[in-house]
Amino acid sequence: MGANVSTPDQRFQVTHFRSTKPWTPRPEIYPFKVNSPCIVEIKNMNQWKSRLNALKDTNKLLVIEFTAKWCGPCKTLEPKLEELAAKYTDVEFVKIDVDVLMSVWMEFNLSTLPAIVFMKRGREVDMVVGVKVDELERKLNKYTQSFF
């Protein structure tokens, strides 16, 4: 008896510590980004159409990541894609959840996840299906260096 009983002074110290030291994650423990500002998540058809129309008349490369919450390989690819989006700042990266916007996924005649589609001037120029990071980076290099 008494092993789990704290004195009033000990309770004050814990309460005082909690009130004066707000918790913040330390970068060495949490090095990942919770929400990548480099990849825009498209959540509805209007957002998709406006993004596509805005880039039709530019030479900017649009990289579309088709994903789903239940897709294991998609989750494997996500951190690498965020790295690439941070590296290739001149490229527009968007993410589309196929469960939310199935019609967009079907426009591209896709059947496998993850799928990455490359577009320039409103038309599809290439794609990568599956977790093929080397191929993805090679194509990013190819389309960011070429102009047409």
From Swiss-Prot:
One of its GO terms (cellular component) is cytoplasm. PROSITE patterns: THIOREDOXIN_1, THIOREDOXIN_2. CDD domains: TRX_family (cd02947). The active site is at residues 71, 74. Gene3D superfamilies: Glutaredoxin. Keywords: Cytoplasm, Disulfide bond, Electron transport, Redox-active center, Transport. It is found in: Cytoplasm. Residues 1-145 form the Thioredoxin domain. Its main location: cytoplasm. It comes from the Eukaryota. The record marks 72-73 as: Contributes to redox potential value. The keyword Transcription regulation does not apply. It holds the Pfam family Thioredoxin. Disulfide bonds join 71-74. Belongs to the thioredoxin family. Plant H-type subfamily. Probable thiol-disulfide oxidoreductase that may be involved in the redox regulation of a number of cytosolic enzymes. This is Thioredoxin H8. The lineage of its organism: Eukaryota, Viridiplantae, Streptophyta, Embryophyta, Tracheophyta. The gene is TRX8.
